[in-house]
Amino acid sequence: MAHTVKIYDTCIGCTQCVRACPTDVLEMVPWKGNNKAGMIAAAPRTEDCVGCKRCETACPTDFLSIRVYLGPETTRSMGLAY
C-alpha cells in the first residue's frame, strides 16, 4: 500500500533514512540547499512504502525532516482512525 512520504528542507543529507528503509523507497539526490552534504533525501517510489516509519525513527534531526503519512486504510486497521 502506498503512503505519502514528505521530505522537508531541514534534511541534512545524512542518508540515515535511506539506509533504514526496508523497501528502497528513498534515495539521495543532488540539492543546492542549506546542508553541507549537497544532497537531500527523495522518495521516488512511494508506491512501495509499507508505512513502517523506520525512516522517521532513523532521522537524527530534531525536526523529523522526513514524515510518512499513513493512508486511511492503514490508520483504520491500526485503530488510529477517528
Swiss-Prot record:
A GO-annotated cellular component: photosystem I
Annotated catalysed reactions: reduced [plastocyanin] + hnu + oxidized [2Fe-2S]-[ferredoxin] = oxidized [plastocyanin] + reduced [2Fe-2S]-[ferredoxin]
Cellular compartments annotated: Cellular thylakoid membrane
Residues noted as binding [4Fe-4S] cluster 1 in the record, renumbered to the chain: 11, 14, 17, 59
Upper lineage: Bacteria, Bacillati, Cyanobacteriota, Cyanophyceae, Synechococcales
Residues engaged in binding [4Fe-4S] cluster 2: 21, 49, 52, 55
Entries under HAMAP family matching the protein: PSI_PsaC
Pfam families xrefs: Fer4_7
Free-text remark on how the cofactor is bound: Binds 2 [4Fe-4S] clusters. Cluster 2 is most probably the spectroscopically characterized electron acceptor FA and cluster 1 is most probably FB.
Protein name: Photosystem I iron-sulfur center
Cited PROSITE patterns: 4FE4S_FER_1, 4FE4S_FER_2
Any GO BP: photosynthetic electron transport in photosystem I
Subunit structure, interactors included: The cyanobacterial PSI reaction center is composed of one copy each of PsaA,B,C,D,E,F,I,J,K,L,M and X, and forms trimeric complexes.
Broad class of enzyme this protein falls into: oxidoreductase
Gene: psaC
Domain 4Fe-4S ferredoxin-type positions: 2-31, 40-69
Membrane topology: Peripheral membrane protein
Requisite cofactors: [4Fe-4S] cluster
